[in-house]
């Protein structure tokens, strides 16, 4: 959530919400119907009724587009048509829907009741409503507490040590995350949605020492991922996975080739501004990650019949998705001509501005077009109020002057006045 900028997702907020709600529902029902048709066939060795089939599909209905961002970031690739913020919004907001579907289906199966449409709508509305309100409330409250601490610390002289302030604010945010999730869950809301909204609000505030806080959160993210995959690895039995390998392969191929594309095209049908190529690529990069595997442990905890097979199938499908889709992200985007070759990839110069300065940092990659009037800074047409602080050429960093000869491919670190706080770091 903290990495999601409101200014970036605003143009794609409606398509993103459609993918994370209607898209998840359609993926679950389409794939669940296919699993139900496979059940009972002698060679599949799975025997699921309709609701358990739907439960299996629901656990796999959310995507892990963070893996896509990692691949794009490592290759320094920029996407056209606002595809990056669209996937960012979808991946951040579709886990709550998949979680609610999983919980509702588990409760229905264990209680032996019928699945009521009105009951599902009521529970979804309740969890979304409480989760959204708690996320906004906790985000605003945490932001004000951080601002109060920063003001009080500066007044007392405690704010003179940036590392101390960064540590305290990071701990405050971490505590707010746990409090937000637990309080929302206690109120019968969706804790995942509340934490995501809280993170969005905090990430769009002008937090002091933002770079240090971001690094702390990245470290915590990696730590949590290591713990999660270690625990999941302890639950896996390779022999049991082999027993369901054939049917898992069929389910995975169906979800990749039919289930996900069909749900994406239906969800995005009202939005005529999204091109066919964009829809095809969004359909292809619906990677499954750790979240579906975690959701598949819920039926095991609740002793749902066939829970062991559900876990093994989800684990197999996730590995298949990462193997097939994860290795073809870049080449599929290139085939569909969705890579923006004109955009300069983000470059981290390791420079951060003070929070009270009404300025921001930008990175510009030079091409022949920018050097048509000359190859020095004094001959370039820079925006008013801009100043070049540093030039990167290959692996060298240079402090520029008016006579430095620039060449295509140079990266300029530019400081500019009067901009929004969304791009204060470079």
Give, region by region, the residue ranges found by the protein language model.
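Alpha-helical membrane-inserting segments
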Residues: 1, 26, 30, 34-38, ...
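Membrane-interface junctions of multi-pass transporters
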Residues: 3-15, 146-172, 177-251, 271-280, ...
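Transmembrane alpha-helices that form the ion-translocation and gating core
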Residues: 9-11, 15-75, 142-145, 238-316, ...
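Hydrophobic faces of alpha-helical transmembrane segments in multi-pass integral membrane proteins
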Residues: 18, 22, 26, 30-31, ...
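Re-entrant/interfacial helical elements at transmembrane boundaries that shape
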Residues: 66-75, 79-88, 98-109, 196-199, ...
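Membrane-interface alpha-helices at helix entry/exit sites of multi-pass transporters
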Residues: 79-90, 94-101, 118-119, 211-215, ...
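Long, charged amphipathic helices and adjacent flexible linkers at domain junctions
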Residues: 341-364
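Cytosolic Rossmann-like ligand/nucleotide-binding regulatory domains
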Residues: 368-424
